[in-house]
């Protein structure tokens, strides 16, 4: 698909589930030669997914061969000692922009960045360089979400709540954060620690623009661990 208007994308993803299909080195479904993520995407599509979130140029290229669903793309690349690793610099934005995908997601937390830029300055740079591209901010707090939205980011994702040292630490999704962002009139894509269908229904009814579910669907090891640990509580 590629470039799409914000309103058209909102219409396409509303009332549905975007499924995150990712596997990193060291995880059971990761293979150096690839080929696994397209199979997960085909399963997600057959189930009725309205979009896909995917990581890396290789995976996204393979996924585009098997689906026309809108893609939220990221590149996870470490830049130690700085913590942000989700589309953390212009290098990753450039690589994703070349793939002609619907949405590019990036870390928009307040943490120190590898490029040394303030997050608003970085947002201004990417918006200027790619004015027709839709962007999603991965944030961990209300303040981060508000800052990114006011700077021109199209969608605010609650992806990193619980994954920064200063954000709310919960086993499940940060429903309070989702609700607060929605009440502020922000286009929210809820994501992060959504493990059960009843959580999806609660989040949907808050008025989100979209919902991303990942590990609870596409990480078999994580799913198995949840069942096994239930026997030992």
Swiss-Prot record:
UniProt xrefs under InterPro entries: Aldolase_TIM, NanE, RibuloseP-bd_barrel
EC number: 5.1.3.9
Catalytic activity: an N-acyl-D-glucosamine 6-phosphate = an N-acyl-D-mannosamine 6-phosphate
UniProt-reported outcome of changing residue 8 to V: In strain: 10581
Consequence of changing residue 19 to V: In strain: DAT2
Pathway info: Amino-sugar metabolism; N-acetylneuraminate degradation; D-fructose 6-phosphate from N-acetylneuraminate: step 3/5
An example Gene Ontology CC term for this record: cytosol
Pfam families found in the cross-reference section: NanE
Keywords for this protein: Carbohydrate metabolism, Isomerase
Gene3D superfamilies, A to Z: Aldolase class I (3.20.20.70)
GO BP annotations listed: carbohydrate metabolic process; N-acetylmannosamine catabolic process; N-acetylneuraminate catabolic process
Function: Converts N-acetylmannosamine-6-phosphate (ManNAc-6-P) to N-acetylglucosamine-6-phosphate (GlcNAc-6-P).
Recorded family membership: Belongs to the NanE family.
PANTHER family: N-ACETYLMANNOSAMINE-6-PHOSPHATE 2-EPIMERASE-RELATED (PTHR36204:SF1)
Protein name: Putative N-acetylmannosamine-6-phosphate 2-epimerase
């Amino acid at each position: 698909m590629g470039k799409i208007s914000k309103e058209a994308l909102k219409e396409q993803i509303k009332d549905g589930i975007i499924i995150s299909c990712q596997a990193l080195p060291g995880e059971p479904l990761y293979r150096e030669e690839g080929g696994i993520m397209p199979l997960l995407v085909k399963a997600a599509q057959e189930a009725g997914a309205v979009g896909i979130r995917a990581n890396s140029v290789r995976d996204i290229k393979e996924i585009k061969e098997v689906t026309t669903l809108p893609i939220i793309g990221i590149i996870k690349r470490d830049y130690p000692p700085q913590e942000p690793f989700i589309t953390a610099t212009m290098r990753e934005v450039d690589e994703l922009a070349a793939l002609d995908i619907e949405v590019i997601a990036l870390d928009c937390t307040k943490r120190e960045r590898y490029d040394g830029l303030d997050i608003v300055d970085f947002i201004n740079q990417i918006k200027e360089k790619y004015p027709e591209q839709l962007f999603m901010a991965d944030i961990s707090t209300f303040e981060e979400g508000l800052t990114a939205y006011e700077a021109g980011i199209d969608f605010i994702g609650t992806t990193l709540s619980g994954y920064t040292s200063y954000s709310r630490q919960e086993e499940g999704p940060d429903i309070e954060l989702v609700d607060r962002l929605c009440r502020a009139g922000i286009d929210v894509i809820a994501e992060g620690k959504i493990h059960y269908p009843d959580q999806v229904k609660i989040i949907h009814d808050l008025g989100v623009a979209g919902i991303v579910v990942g590990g609870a669907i596409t990480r078999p090891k994580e799913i198995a661990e949840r069942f096994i640990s239930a026997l030992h509580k």
